[in-house]
């Protein structure tokens, strides 16, 4: 197995760091780092559901993805200034939402929404996969918050963990967790979202200027799923620590006689 420009083996993830309680106000707030890629993921419960969801008795989960203007080497203009979201931003936002909805029983939320926000602070490839992986941890913390507040119909609505990783063919070799330098010249580029129960949520894959055989697809998936297993361990280790956010306030104490 060959080494890469950054010294990693083909099947080796970049250093993964998950920091919970990164900001104070959201119910779930996480900074996730895949090497030099850093994404802030928050999960915020809000009252109500979209209009088309009203009356269903079920909640909703939505996600938004964005990059800070200086997340890359060259500053980009804020999309809010442009007045429109790029197709890439919309695609990744929907991907994150779909991925997280695969692991939660929305009926347990009642008619309430969890809004997930993923903001890329620094980009070096794999921002969407880092966002999905970190957003799951933020969601788990938001569920802990809602359960402590007595706002869930089912105190354990999460059925599985969700993680994502990039994988591709670079220099004729199958490699996992591509940096920007590798991703920009990959012959095959793929993103894999999986559950810790061994099932797949989504696969996004393209031959970048070249076709590839079924046997390569199988090898790509095998390497991606092996990497996701390592990400699940990182998620579990992070979530094993005490809840980092502010605990919900309980009901007000009964008034004293005569007050």
Curated annotation (Swiss-Prot):
Against Gene3D superfamilies, the record matches this protein to: GHMP Kinase, N-terminal domain
Coiled-coil annotated spans: none
The terms under GO molecular function for this entry are: 3'-5'-RNA exonuclease activity; tRNA binding; tRNA nucleotidyltransferase activity
Q: Signal sequence span per UniProt? A: none
Which residues does the record give as phosphate binding sites?
88, 126-128
UniProtKB keywords: Nucleotidyltransferase, RNA-binding, rRNA processing, Transferase, tRNA processing, tRNA-binding
Tell me its EC number(s), please. 2.7.7.56
Q: Organism's domain of life?
A: Bacteria
Looking up PANTHER family in the UniProt record yields:
EXOSOME COMPLEX COMPONENT, EXOSOME COMPLEX COMPONENT RRP41
Family, as annotated: Belongs to the RNase PH family.
Function description: Phosphorolytic 3'-5' exoribonuclease that plays an important role in tRNA 3'-end maturation. Removes nucleotide residues following the 3'-CCA terminus of tRNAs; can also add nucleotides to the ends of RNA molecules by using nucleoside diphosphates as substrates, but this may not be physiologically important. Probably plays a role in initiation of 16S rRNA degradation (leading to ribosome degradation) during starvation.
This chain belongs to the protein called: Ribonuclease PH
Gene this chain is encoded by: rph
């Amino acid at each position: 197995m060959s080494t890469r420009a950054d010294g990693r083996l083909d099947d080796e993830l970049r250093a993964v760091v998950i920091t919970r309680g990164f900001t104070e106000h959201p119910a779930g707030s996480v900074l996730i780092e895949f090497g030099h890629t850093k994404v802030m993921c928050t999960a915020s419960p809000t009252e109500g559901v979209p209009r088309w969801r009203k009356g269903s008795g079920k909640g909703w989960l939505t996600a938004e993805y964005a990059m800070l203007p200086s997340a890359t080497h060259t500053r980009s203009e804020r999309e809010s200034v442009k007045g429109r979201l790029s197709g890439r931003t919309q695609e990744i936002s929907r991907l994150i939402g779909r991925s997280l909805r695969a692991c939660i029983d929305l009926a347990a939320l009642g008619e309430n929404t969890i809004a997930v926000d993923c903001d890329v602070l620094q980009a070096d490839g794999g921002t969407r996969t880092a966002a999905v992986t970190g957003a799951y941890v933020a969601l788990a913390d938001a569920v802990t918050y809602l359960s402590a507040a007595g706002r869930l119909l089912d105190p354990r609505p999460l059925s599985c963990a969700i993680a994502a990783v990039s994988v591709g063919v670079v220099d004729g070799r199958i490699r996992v967790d591509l940096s920007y330098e590798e991703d920009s010249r990959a012959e095959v580029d793929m993103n894999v979202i999986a559950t810790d129960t061994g099932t797949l949520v989504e696969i996004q894959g393209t031959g970048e200027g070249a076709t590839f055989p079924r046997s390569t697809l199988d090898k790509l998936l095998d390497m991606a799923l092996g990497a996701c297993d390592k990400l699940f361990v990182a998620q579990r280790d992070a979530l094993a620590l005490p809840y980092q956010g502010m605990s919900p306030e309980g009901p007000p104490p009964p008034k004293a006689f005569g007050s």
